Amino acid sequence: LKDEGEGENTMNRFIIADPKKCIGCRTCEVACVLAHNGGKLDTLTKANFAPRLKVVKGLNVSTAIMCRHCEDAPCANVCPNGAIVRAADSIQVLQEKCIGCKTCVVACPYGAMSVVTKQVEVMFNGLSQGFCLKAEAQKCDLCEGQAAGPACISVCPTQALHMIGRDTMQAMLRKKQMRAALDEANEMSF
């Protein structure tokens, strides 16, 4: 996995959904699409709607599924063009290198990758030569480059989405260890 200038001992950040809080409203999907398309409302049409996360609804539960920014990311490991890299404590797609081969979609264990087709302008010597279709891999990029951070987190009406980083993960681990220690201590008899 190519590392774009990150330290070796850092953990990738990721967003996780709490299915106990998710109501399946899809507000996160809408916020994602708007955040990645400059707030243009025409991207909310059925033909153009391509969120980088997906709300999955079951009979009794709903939750958002998105990229977990794996440390040893299967999508990056199989990319034949080196278009998926580790950068800014996350896994990012370099669209200029992506050839839309869908290998990453097959490799992702979470179903968090998709390939979308976009119309792009073809330029030659600074002049437009028209438009063509380009397929490109898409996944959660943690709204990288947006000062407000991930749009999905800030709009969730039930606060079901949370950013997990190294500190949060360590705090969760300590809490679980303490709970396990107390549970075991309560059941001991000598």
Question: What is the predicted role of each segment?
Answer:
Residues T27-T43:
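Core segments of cupin and vicinal oxygen chelate
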Residues A17, V93-L94:
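Hydrophobic face of beta-strands forming the core of extended beta-sheets/solenoids
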Residues C70-A83, A87-Q92:
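Ordered, amphipathic secondary-structure segments that act as subunit-interaction surfaces
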Residues E6-E8, N12, K40-T45, A50-N77, ...:
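Flanking helices and flexible, charged tails adjoining ferredoxin-like Fe-S electron-transfer domains
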Residues I15-K20, T27:
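N-terminal "mature ectodomain cap" immediately after the signal peptide
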Residues V33-H36, P80, P109:
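Protein kinase-like catalytic domain
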Residues I23-R26, K102:
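Conserved active-site region of classical short-chain dehydrogenase/reductase
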